[in-house]
Amino acid sequence: ASQKRPSQRHGSKYLATASTMDHARHGFLPRHRDTGILDSIGRFFGGDRGAPKRGSGKDSHHPARTAHYGSLPQKSGHRTQDENPVVHFFKNIVTPRTPPPSQGKGRGLSLSRFSWGAEGQRPGFGYGGRASDYKSAHKGFKGAQDAQGTLSKIFKLGGRDSRSGSPMARR
């Protein structure tokens, strides 16, 4: 029992405080950029829906690139251009895991922040945990280690791309 309790507490504590920990401890890492994305996404889910569609049809590819790697906080004033592709990218990641559509803003912000934060710190927690669950469920108990080997390969090889592709491919 004494072994079980700390691990459980640690698990739930991590889940509960993932976003705050990220911002406090890792503010200086690239994650700092993501807050720009997350903010605009929160606004998008909150009701900016009409604005991004207006001028962004043609530009959608380039802003998506700059948005992910570059100057989000400065750009967020320009939301008509970079929001649409960015949000599209995030929706693909976030939607499979969001049961309550009613939450709106909270959904976009907390969910995407949690998944980014978690996988930044410990690949096993975000999609990693889920993917290995699925895989080990199929293969049985022996497959659990296999699944993790595969996962680390995926994370090393494709990083962001393979991860955003896999949940969609699976569903």
Curated annotation (Swiss-Prot):
Post-translational modification: As in other animals, several charge isomers may be produced as a result of optional post-translational modifications, such as phosphorylation of serine or threonine residues, deamidation of glutamine or asparagine residues, citrullination and methylation of arginine residues. Phosphorylated by TAOK2, VRK2, MAPK11, MAPK12, MAPK14 and MINK1.
InterPro entries registered for this protein in UniProt: Myelin_BP
Modified residue annotations for N-acetylalanine: 1
Deamidated glutamine modified-residue sites: 103, 148
PROSITE patterns for the chain: MYELIN_MBP (PS00569)
Sites of Phosphoserine modification: 7, 12, 19, 40, 56, 76, 115, 162, 166
Modified residues (Omega-N-methylarginine): 43, 49, 107
Positions of modified residues (Citrulline): 25, 31, 122, 130, 160, 171
Source taxon at top rank: Eukaryota
Full protein name: Myelin basic protein
Source taxonomy: Eukaryota, Metazoa, Chordata, Craniata, Vertebrata
